[in-house]
Amino acid sequence: MGKVVGIDLGTTNSVVAVMEGGKPIVIANAEGMRTTPSVVGFNKEGELVVGQMGRRQAVLNPQNTFYGVKRFMGRRYTDLTPESKRVAYTIRRDDRDNIKVRCPRLKKDFAPEEISAMILRKLAEEASRYLGEKVTGAVITVPAYFNDSQRQATRDAGKIAGLEVLRIINEPTAASLAYGLDQGRIQKILVFDLGGGTFDVSVLEVGDGIFEVKATSGDTQLGGNDFDRRIVDWLAEKFLEAEKVDLRQDRQALQRLTEAAEKAKIELSGVGTTEINLPFITATEDGPKHLETQLSRSEFEDLCGDLVTRLQRPVKRVLKDAGLSPVQIDEVVLVGGGTRMPMVKGLVRSFIDREPNENVNPDEVVAIGAAIQAGILDGEVKDILLLDVTPLSFGLETIGGVMKKLLPRNTTIPVRKSDIFSTGENNQTVVEVHVLQGEREMASDNISLGRFKLSGIPPAPRGVPQVQVSFDIDANGILQVTARDKTTGREQSITVQGASILSEGEVNRMIQEAETFAAQDRERRERIEKRNSAKALTDQAQRRLKEVTLDFGSAFTVSYRRQVDALCSEILDSLEKDDERRLDRAQADLQDVLYELNREVRLQYDDKEEGFFEAIKKTFTGDFDDDDDYYNRRPAPRDDYRGGNDYGRYDDYNYNAPSRREAPMPRAGAGRGPSLSKDYRSTAYADWDQSRVTRQRPYQGESLGGTYDDRRSSPQDDYSRGDRQKDYDYRENAPSRSGRGGNGRYGERPAQPGRNAPLQNGWDDDDDDWF
């Protein structure tokens, strides 16, 4: 199995984290941000864009950009309130009362689980890129007050994204893991989690590696988006009063209002007043209209007074369920971006009478806790025991439509509990078990999780048969219900998945479609990368050509310039016409030309470096004799590319050898590229060649008829006079090597022959010069 990550799938933003070296690390996305907007869109080409790219095109493409879908997961259309339906895109219902999101661009309906799966896949891909290995498993967080249907919908989203969901963990519990991982002492902490779409509050006892949830409460339809909506309504009403136009009826204007409201809410957390300017928000017969106004913090708090009151109720309930008073709370941990609002912080201070702990990042702490839970499951984190609870009560429908609770809310999980039921009529052979979740007394007011029948019960009077019903909740909060007839031993069970709304066939179909989108994304990314690399190659080629021209002159690069310009034009034309085959061919040719250019430049620099370092060596050693390997090994023509000129090899001891100043003979089959012929060589070494002194010396005796030509002067000789081509007699007139201005290094010594002069009588008189 691959790497397991922790994912905070949020209403507004999502975060992914992983355990590395025993510590949780938040992974930044491709845009460099540690949080990824929970936004999915389809642009005008029908391509999928997720995260920040999806958010950027929301104003111009509101009907094909989907946000806040977490609120719709695991719910029926009839469960939605009018406010929750007020989004810029289209929400519709199918024939089974399921929620569908309409995408006009693709002419297709998506389930909320599919949209969330696209976000999860994006996060998993970012984690795979960071880790260098495929991510196959995940621990995903959900609001603590999510019911079983919403939890199962989250698992379905992970499955559609191609992930194995190892654990579903409550967001406040994950936050407590991140906060209390390094806490040694036992503390009672209250986690206040106000996200974009949901609100949760939990009380936990943390210490000695044990995280025990005492109670949890919340509101799955209350979050930061509701505060944004108050600003949207305020702006729309103000504009309606002034211009007689309701901006909420225009999808594009509504999207702009929503973004401006969120920005204003964020700014009011740090300043007392904010400006809201939306030019050209709409147009009437009188022309374009603009929205310009100011919103103060006090006005904002007045707009949201009832929302703050709604925040108080779950806090009171959770303290009551935990059996604690506010003064018994040791720490308050704030989670979610909504907790940055001063009115929310003020509520916590007044209610708990304690300053909130702000040592954790409210946007990242949940994902960090999920990563820790992933480390626990993976064996990387040890000595941690997490005891979570059920957020809502589980029970059965009994006679009269009353709900019988088997598992009260805040029951520690995993848990198994059984109870005995009987028939309601005489000779009843079939019992229908209706599983419910909720806190209301009547079954019709609670959430129906599923139904199943137990048949084969022997006929008997009413109340005689005994049917044992067992509720089994695993660590993920997923419920399995089993009914067993104690008389016959017949048994029937159900794993509550009908609550996920999606059938197994629908989930499999969505998995295949998600894989198709992933393949399209890969192809699109590869195509974009290819186009970007081709354009970058043209810029690189032109830049390199300019550098080489400055170093070696335009004559050196004339043939390369023609090739580079032609191929760059070919690449740009191929990009414009979207001709990939032609683009690949031109790109490969340009890479070849650049390779040859860089190779030729490298050879020229090698020649220069060899001459430079050899000169330094001669300066310090005084060795200017004719065994100079640098010139004896001057390379022959290196390859066909260098112009086909043959310089030959030179023998300083053979006067019949071709002179270096002779024009080289062209070689058959000359290759491409600029010619490095005599003209170029003579340019490079002109001054040096003219300064050399030709000295003809006897070579191994006059009888051989040879001469010795080293063509170079000794640095000790005084050649200031104009007669620089004078031939010196080898034995009598050769200048002394040691006579530097009359004072040799070792005193006045007889003139010595050069190091490479022919041996006299088999002995070199200069062998002991430096010993």
From Swiss-Prot:
GO terms for biological process: chaperone cofactor-dependent protein refolding; protein refolding. Gene3D superfamilies: 3.30.420.40, Actin, Chain A, domain 4 (3.90.640.10), Substrate Binding Domain Of DNAk, Chain A, domain 1 (2.60.34.10). It holds the Pfam family HSP70. Induction: By stress conditions e.g. heat shock. Keywords: ATP-binding, Chaperone, Nucleotide-binding, Phosphoprotein, Stress response. Residues 630-652, 708-734 have a biased composition (Basic and acidic residues). InterPro entries: ATPase_NBD, Chaperone_DnaK, Heat_shock_70_CS, HSP70_peptide-bd_sf, Hsp_70_fam. The modification Phosphothreonine is found at T198. One of its GO terms (molecular function) is unfolded protein binding. Residues 624-771 are annotated as: Disordered. It comes from the Bacteria. NCBIfam families: PRK00290.1, PRK13410.1, prok_dnaK. HAMAP family: DnaK (MF_00332). Acts as a chaperone. Belongs to the heat shock protein 70 family. This is Chaperone protein dnaK3. The gene is dnaK3.
